[in-house]
Amino acid sequence: MKQSVKFKALYWDIAADLLFPPNFDETKKYPVIISTHPIGSCKEQTSGNVYGQAFADAGFVVLVPDASFQGESGGEPRYIEDPSFRVEDYSYACDYLVTLPFVDEKRIGVLGICGAGGYSINATMKERRIKAVATITGANYGRVMREFGDPIANLEAIAEQRTAEARGAALRVDQGLYPTVEAAKADNANIDLLEATKYYRTSRGEKPNGVNKTLFSHNATALTWDAYNLAEKLLTQPLLVIVGGIPGGFGAYRDGFEIVRRAASTKKELFVIENWSHYDLYDKPEPVKQALDKLIPFYKENL
């Protein structure tokens, strides 16, 4: 069973799907998992139709939101990818969940996929209502942004674009992926960009709201941000990090090792799914099964 819901953010609403377990009883209290989508994705893709549904089938209530400024969520201008807003979305989700009579507010966990893995970890440090965090191919978006191109040159370009927009120029909306798989292959794209195109630009994973667009003039925060800052002091909740064993250009593989090494959590684990890549873990049955075989016991033990 699924219900479309909205809850308040700062000055706009966040849209989400609320997934219920079989034989749901509204008089009981349930543990909840907030399942959050990759950068450029939406709630109808892997966070919802793969992992979210599996968690609901396993007995959890699951909240699958669209990020602020994206998908069916509110916020203007559209396509802002700003870590400060993305991280705060988790607190707004907790604010909503604690108002629901069937939610056990002491048993809230989060899952973050790809860039939302970094967001989930950062949010868990400050949001103590989150009791356990897991990531699937989690990436530190700030590091990714700094490694793709010259960060100083990009910050200068952002400053120029903001000035132009303040004076009336059109907004610059960047497309994060190739339009087709053939275009990605022709450009010799790295494995992550090629496989992202295969997922987002074909019937395999394509959804109307999974547009992979960003508003260029609002990218400066990401360039100066570190998802794992203060993890040695503040990340104390149970942590499960799952990565594919085939490293790719987005760096989730090495980020996984880094955050498990740095986290203050006494209960923490890195699980490498050998012979599978970043995007295989989005929806391929075998690696997804391996991931769920770790995730579901992790949440049942720690929530």
PLM regions: where:
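N-terminal cap/lid segment of alpha/beta-hydrolase-fold proteins
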Residues: 1-28
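The serine-hydrolase catalytic nucleophile loop
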Residues: 40-53, 67
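Conserved alpha/beta-hydrolase
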Residues: 54-74
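Alpha/beta-hydrolase active-site loop
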Residues: 80-101
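Alpha/beta-hydrolase-fold enzymes
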Residues: 121-202
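Short beta-strand/loop motif that positions the catalytic acidic residue
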Residues: 234, 241-243
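Conserved alpha/beta-hydrolase "acid-adjacent" motif
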Residues: 248-256
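Catalytic histidine-centered segment of alpha/beta-hydrolase-like enzymes
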Residues: 276-288
